Amino acid sequence: MFFTSLHRGVRLAFAACALAFSASAAAAQSVSLQGHLPFILASAQRLDRVAAGEQVSLALVLPLRNQDRLADLLHRLYTPGDLLYGRYLTPDTFAQQFSPTPSDYAAVIAFAQAQGLTVTATHSNRTVVDVAGNAQTVENAFGVQLDRYRLPAGRTFRAPSGEPQIPAQLVGRLAAVVGLDTAAVWHAHNKMKPVPPQGAATLFEPRQTGSGPGGGLSPTDIKTAYSLNSIGASGAGQALAVFELDGYTTSDITSYESYFGLPNVPLQNVLVDSYSGAPGSGAGEVTLDIELQIAVAPSISKIYVYEGPNSNAGVVDTYNRIATDNL
């Protein structure tokens, strides 16, 4: 059971909350949690209701405490000359000052389990509770109906019929139910422009943007573009993490390093939410991200490649994993 990964304070708080929620969760006053209806619903056509047995994964997000103080701290951390400039907090210190309390975290867990949802993961910073259940269980838990929609371009997605409902005692404790809809999909913004037949002869002429093959950017070009040539640091002794929503092919990275005479930087994949890591349609972006880091910091000791599902919940969990790992 997941309880073994929770601190003792959270376990004790959970026991009390579980009793409270199991007593009369259904009869409790509910409150609408705003911000869960995707704007593209206005241009979408409703198709039908999501099958009752379809599995749904959600990230229950809790609000941070002391947000005014956090905003001030963030400003000072990045203001040269300030006494706090560059003095970043450890994960433990951040949790003590800004994370939700153990009792609030336990309350969200207790609510989820009282509704029949399975808690699939908890996190040390107490900001996210990952849960899963079939569509019918999710609908009952949050007082919504999950429907399927189709956009004019043909893509289909899931969305709730209305804003989720939560018990009044969770107001201020639960900020968002991420994953009710699948409307948002991250994608690259580069577009291929069709070339008419008469222009086919110029299709393979290199665009002289950079000094690399086919006019591509070499490591020197990249440093010039970002005004990094005058910076002596090369990343020696440091590790980097990159946020990704797709996989990549390792040989693409090693070929890049070999062609430009760069060191062979070790890569370590960190797969989030059971993501397979298999390269898909977004693999090119992932490859570019990794190569960019190697180009500007060739002496780094390792790159951690965090890969999660291309979904709202996947984005939340991947960023949160980077923060809590603190590698």
Please give the residue ranges for each predicted region.
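Positively charged, low-complexity intrinsically disordered regions
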Residues: 8-12, 208
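N-terminal secretory signal peptides that target proteins for export/translocation
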Residues: 1-9
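Substrate-binding/charge-relay-adjacent region of secreted/lumenal peptidase catalytic domains
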Residues: 29-124, 130, 135-327
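Intrinsically disordered, low-complexity segments
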Residues: 3, 20-22, 209
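Bacterial N-terminal signal peptides
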Residues: 11-22
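Sec/Tat signal peptide C-region and signal peptidase I cleavage site
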Residues: 24-28
